Design a protein with these regions (language model features):
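Cysteine-nucleophile amide-bond enzymes
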Residues: 1-191
Length: 191
């Protein structure tokens, strides 16, 4: 049995505050990692943690996120998958990253989400809708609704979850790299 890692993220900011008001939990972003240290993790979100207006598919860098949001908190789950599922998901994530500028954040979909109506525009996702679709298509998880209606709250409420970390992002960064004087200088995309 292999593992995939889902991170629920609590960050500050106006957009985060609005999402928090709608979904009623603090964790407003979700990312998927192929490893426990989040060296290779992906999501649909900000292309640069410092600029909220440009969003799409990206490889996340926990060190850059920590620089932008020093008070960010993470809750990390390990979920079971087969070796073949993990290989397939890794391939799909890397292909999406290779074509990352073809994937965009689905602003319009947020209004449909609020209305409870499924909506899909090609290559446009929220962080949770992308992850829900990927995990469902690879038979790792299923949700009782259309992938476009899945929110971080649905990941928060997963029944089969093994919490492996909950706390400040700084602690997760230190677990991944115990030399804190180094990580703020890592270039974007490495982690």
């Amino acid at each position: 049995m292999q593992k995939l890692y889902i991170a629920l993220v609590d960050t500050p900011g106006l957009f985060a505050w609005m999402i928090r008001r709608v979904i009623k939990i603090n964790y407003i972003h979700v990312a998927l990692s192929l490893d426990e240290e989040f060296r290779e993790s992906y999501s649909v979100g900000r292309r640069n943690p410092f600029l909220p207006f440009f969003a799409g598919f990206e490889q996340e860098n926990i060190y850059r996120i920590h620089q932008a949001f020093p008070t960010a908190r993470y809750k990390v789950y390990a979920i079971d998958c087969t070796e073949q599922q993990k290989e397939d998901i890794a391939f799909q994530l890397r292909e999406c990253y290779r074509h990352r500028y073809q994937y965009h954040y689905c602003i319009i979909g947020l209004f449909y989400l609020l209305a409870g109506k499924p909506f899909y525009q090609k290559n446009h996702y929220t962080c949770s809708s992308f992850l829900a679709r990927l995990l469902e298509e690879n038979h790792v998880l299923t949700f009782p609704k259309h992938f476009s209606l899945v929110t971080p709250k649905d990941f928060y409420e997963l029944e089969k979850q093994e919490v492996i970390f909950k706390g400040p992002l700084r602690e997760l960064c230190l677990r991944a790299n115990p030399c804190p004087s180094v990580y703020p200088y890592l270039p974007f995309g490495i982690g």
